[in-house]
Amino acid sequence: MRLNKMINNPLLTVKNLNKFFNEQQVLHDISFSLQRGEILFLLGSSGCGKTTLLRAIAGFEQPSNGEIWLKERLIFGENFNLPTQQRHLGYVVQEGVLFPHLNVYRNIAYGLGNGKGKNSEEKTRIEQIMQLTGIFELADRFPHQLSGGQQQRVALARALAPNPELILLDEPFSALDEHLRQQIRQEMLQALRQSGASAIFVTHDRDESLRYADKIAIIQQGKILQIDTPRTLYWSPNHLETAKFMGESIVLPANLLDENTAQCQLGNIPIKNKSISQNQGRILLRPEQFSLFKTSENPTALFNGQIKQIEFKGKITSIQIEINGYAIWIENVISPDLSIGDNLPVYLHRKGLFYS
């Protein structure tokens, strides 16, 4: 995250936002803030409320109650709902939605309000945005002459044209094939960073959010479970459900021996939680915490294991090891000379997380 983001006044503030469709509540007391230049990913499964939240910020959906502030300006509150066109936000959806009768240049010019882009100031701005998004050579093409990735870049350029401080993107890469998705995603994120705009992405792709977000908001059933940096959500989540959602995990019943140690089927595991209410619960570990090699002078714990399966995958070898009757998979980049049935030490790196 860039240093210029760390300022006192957030760009966007959402306070106690609720939304009902008839009698069904789809947003539950949503509150968060977004700093200038920050990129936030709303992460959750289909139907969790993330798109509804994005549309509420844009003004396409009217919340039932709560407040939305853009800088120090109220854009939604009690008896007040600022129209979408007056919020000065950019919005990009899954498949770009370009005007088929306008070429790329005119589509971007439409983002400036008149669809012409004829005066020198507008021309300069459009050319800057086309350079930024890597579509300068496509200026005279029409949407049907563009690939899916090119259409998404044009849609982003159109959203950036009026120089909004906040861009909202609703799963903009989901309609692209995997190879193209990786390329376009990286290019669009780079363009957003260079523009200085803040952005909120809706996604169900965990790896995408871990890789590109400054912060991630985990949304389940219309509620934000936790909002934090990708590293914090992965290694120090507040809730077990968040931990499991953020990546592959090993979860075992456990008992506290003291405030720093829990006992589970694997053995005694050092833990790092400091606020624990009960002595019985579950411990969470990530598979990558286990290694057949001593990668630090003081590993967190040491176990005796036996190899049960070996799967060679080229540069990676997956090894299933049983520790005290519990089997875990370890991936090794370096493939040592090992055989099924071998007994060997297994090292644990980093502490576990205990949830009561």
UniProtKB/Swiss-Prot annotation:
Molecular function terms from GO: ABC-type ferric iron transporter activity; ATP binding; ATP hydrolysis activity; transmembrane transporter activity
GO CC field: plasma membrane
Localization: Cell inner membrane
InterPro entries noted in UniProt: AAA+_ATPase, ABC_SmlMolc_Importer, ABC_transporter-like_ATP-bd, ABC_transporter-like_CS, ABC_transpr_FbpC, Mo/tungstate-bd_C_term_dom, P-loop_NTPase
Principal place of residence: membrane
Keyword set includes Cell inner membrane: yes
An individual GO BP term: transmembrane transport
Keyword Membrane: yes
Binding site for ATP: G44, S45, S46, G47, C48, G49, K50, T51
Assigned keywords, A-Z: ATP-binding, Cell inner membrane, Cell membrane, Ion transport, Iron, Iron transport, Membrane, Nucleotide-binding, Translocase, Transport
Family: Belongs to the ABC transporter superfamily. Fe(3+) ion importer (TC 3.A.1.10) family.
Main function: Part of the ABC transporter complex FbpABC involved in Fe(3+) ions import. Responsible for energy coupling to the transport system.
Quaternary structure and partners: The complex is composed of two ATP-binding proteins (FbpC), two transmembrane proteins (FbpB) and a solute-binding protein (FbpA).
Stated name of the protein: Fe(3+) ions import ATP-binding protein FbpC 2
Originating species: Haemophilus influenzae (strain ATCC 51907 / DSM 11121 / KW20 / Rd)
Lineage of source species: Bacteria, Pseudomonadati, Pseudomonadota, Gammaproteobacteria, Pasteurellales
Name of the gene encoding the protein in the UniProt record: fbpC2
